């Protein structure tokens, strides 16, 4: 595999992708994240410098840091919200036996890969259209 100079190399756990006007955005959680605020990344899958932002998992709020300063437009917010509310691509079940949605999966990815800070079990799924 050829690594381009502009690519970052780190562990990531991809939750999925959404597409807007031909641009594919990936939603992922970094593994062993040094930050103590549970968040996920939303970025242009093919051009990381074109669009990249971070969003908190527990509330509808941006977690801007470093070069990750972009803001979602209304269409991107709706795509993100629809994605988070949708069932996971691979069938997964929560502890009550209900099928997991993508937001629950993102929570699980954070908790599985970032042991310093876990998301409380009573956290309510935010409405990401309110970003």
Q: What does each model-identified segment do?
A:
Residues 1-131:
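Metal-centered catalytic cores of metalloenzymes
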């Amino acid at each position: 595999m050829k690594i381009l100079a502009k690519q970052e190399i780190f562990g990531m756990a991809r939750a999925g992708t959404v597409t807007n006007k031909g641009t594919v955005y990936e939603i992922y959680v970094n593994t062993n994240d040094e930050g103590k605020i549970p968040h996920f990344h939303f970025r242009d899958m093919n051009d990381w410098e074109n669009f990249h932002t971070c969003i908190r998992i527990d509330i509808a709020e941006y977690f801007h840091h470093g070069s990750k300063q972009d803001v979602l437009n209304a269409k991107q917010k709706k795509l993100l919200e629809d994605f988070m509310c949708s069932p996971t691509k691979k069938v997964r079940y929560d502890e009550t036996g209900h099928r997991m949605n993508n937001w629950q999966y993102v929570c699980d990815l954070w908790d599985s890969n970032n042991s310093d800070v876990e998301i409380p079990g009573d956290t309510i799924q935010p409405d990401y259209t309110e970003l």
